[in-house]
Amino acid sequence: MSETKSGKAIHEGWLLGVLAAIQFTAVLDFMIIMPLGPQYMRVFHIDPSQFGLIVSAYAIAAGIAGIIAGFFIDRFDRKRAMLVLYAGFTLGTLFCAMAPSYQTLVAARVVAGAFGGVTMGLVMAVIGDVIPEIRRGRAMGIVMSSFSVASICGVPIGLYLANEMDWHIPFYALAGLCVFVTLGVAKVMPSLRGHIDRVAQQPPAEMMAGILKEASNRRALMFMATLICTGFCVFPFLATYMVKNVGLTEKQLPWIYICGGVCTLVSMNLIGRWADRAGKRRVFTIMMLASMIPVLIVTNLPHVAVWIALTISTIFMVCSSGRIVPAMAMLTASVEPHQRGGFMSINSSVQQLSSGVAAWLSGVIIGQSGGHMTRFGIVGGLSVIFGLAAIYLARFLKTTGAGTAVQGIVET
């Protein structure tokens, strides 16, 4: 069994578990906002555009913070950076729980987003540093399964707590969970400093320019922007559409996340293994093309039986999540190791800003008439266009072959 410099053996499985827990809390913090929209509108007496600001505040703050962090994130031990960033995210979540008004909630979302967005980017950088290329698809599948677990457990439990007690309670519970995850990071995650030796001692702006001057890095960021826009044209408005147009009640909304989460929990790991065997670009292309069918169906769905709505929304979630796993594996492999932390921080910013732009653009397109959403089908078509662009850009991603195991990380 290998050891770190401190003499402490670290198992790859334990590390992936901690990274998945970090990702779970960050994802849940973002996901729980959308189905709580009706409650926020009633409690704060706000309109949909004001609710949209609650959502976009997180994304915009995360994007800006990620750009700033990209200037210096590669100069620090990954573990130390993770502990500091995650502590900030925990405080931001606690501030959300304590928010007494609409304005303070928006401010708290800015804090949570600023730290949470960079944290998620750092998780991907750690995976790229410690997981060999041959197993990276599987590792991405495990960590990205946090989306499914958040859907299966986090969102339904959060909605139950909000419905039975108060909308503040889910954030108090999440902040408490973050404390335990922080202890896990301190216990399990090793000191990762190998990348520092490869970072040239240069001004931060010059280092950032060095990352962005690489055409392959710019194409990779464009690829991720189109991929995120593909999903976030639709996701923020899915729950509202299901209630207003398809006929689900607010109490039935958790079933969308439960059914979709259970299936994606299984499918993402299978797709990760498939990508390792069959090739990540090939699997990405297949999953992206497959996802276009349920996108067009779900955005044009009329009033149907609950089981039909849940079946279609579940297929939509499985296909949508399935394209993320090979995409992230391709992305981490396309960046040189000494640039990976900074690049993934920039990438996290691109993801957040892209999600905000996509949600804003869809909000401009979508209308309301007679209590129903209109023009959601146009949004579905826009999602397909972004998807085709992502397939085209994926052809230009390079593979560095980087990602050998770090000393002290052993596969379980």
Model-derived segments and their meaning:
Residues 142-189:
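Helix-loop-helix hairpin linking two adjacent transmembrane segments in secondary transporters
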Residues 163-175, 364-385:
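A membrane-interface helix-boundary motif in multi-pass transporters
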Residues 108-149:
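Cytoplasmic helix-loop-helix junction between adjacent transmembrane helices
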Residues 2-9, 190-222:
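Juxtamembrane intracellular "pre-TM" segments in multi-pass secondary transporters
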Residues 64-103:
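Conserved MFS/SLC helix-loop-helix module at the cytosolic interface between two early adjacent transmembrane helices
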Residues 281-327:
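C-terminal transmembrane helical hairpin of 12-TM major facilitator-type secondary transporters
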Residues 45, 77, 98-104, 247, ...:
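Helix-breaking motifs and short loop linkers at transmembrane-helix boundaries and internal kinks
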Residues 34, 217-258:
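Extracytoplasmic gate region of multi-pass secondary transporters
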